[in-house]
């Protein structure tokens, strides 16, 4: 805040409040009902009880991601509401990573491997959620790499994914991961920022998360339907 003198005395000048691009939040808000419908379809058509439970975890994490993001980014909130929703929005990124790993790990890996990996992934997600909840003001350069690193934590199991799920599943998992990663880099750098008034860097990031979810959804569907 600065002050300036005029003929009538000092005038307080406040710093301008950043204006959200007009498309902020619409992509995720619009995606939410589609995720609900697609998620129910995935759960119902899954070939086994194990697959249905694993897919339900994945679908729930996706609904939270897109639903909370849509509410947070479309609304105008006071300081307290802003802080709560921002914490939930950022924490849900760790949740969707673990949720995506759940059907892939439980349905493509043997029990001896899937159980330790599930503990590791969900333990990392719990730590990440606590990190974002209790340190919501952490710098982007710190927490963004955490998202990306956790997303690729099971890279050494990709050959196992291919052996059990096939080359199509492997390609879809990798492509989805790359889309999420590119989105994370754009979010961290705030570049490119094509149209700050309409469609900024955050909308590019949301577009890539949406595309990544669709790619992973197709891959997980292939896995769930062949159990």
In which residue ranges do the predicted regions lie?
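Multi-pass alpha-helical transmembrane bundles in non-GPCR membrane proteins
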Residues: 1-227
């Amino acid at each position: 805040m600065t002050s300036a003198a005029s003929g009538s005395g000092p005038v307080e000048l406040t710093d301008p409040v950043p204006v959200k691009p007009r498309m902020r939040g619409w992509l995720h808000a619009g995606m939410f009902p589609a995720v609900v419908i697609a998620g129910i379809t995935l759960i119902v058509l899954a070939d086994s009880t194990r697959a249905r439970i694993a897919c339900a975890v994945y679908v729930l994490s996706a609904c939270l991601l897109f639903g909370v993001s849509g509410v947070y980014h479309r609304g105008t909130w006071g300081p307290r509401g802003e802080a709560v929703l921002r914490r939930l929005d950022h924490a849900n990124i760790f949740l969707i990573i673990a949720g995506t790993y759940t059907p892939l790990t439980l349905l493509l890996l043997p029990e001896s491997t899937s159980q330790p990996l599930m503990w590791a992934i969900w333990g990392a997600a719990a730590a990440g959620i606590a990190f974002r909840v209790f340190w919501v003001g952490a710098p982007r350069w710190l927490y963004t790499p955490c998202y990306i690193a956790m997303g690729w934590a099971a890279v050494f199991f990709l050959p196992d994914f291919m052996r059990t799920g096939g080359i199509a599943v492997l390609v879809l998992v990798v492509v989805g991961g790359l889309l999420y990663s590119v989105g994370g880099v754009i979010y961290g750098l705030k570049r490119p920022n094509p149209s700050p008034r309409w469609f900024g860097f955050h909308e590019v990031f949301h577009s890539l998360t949406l595309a990544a979810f669709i790619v992973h959804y197709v891959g997980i569907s292939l896995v769930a339907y062949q159990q």
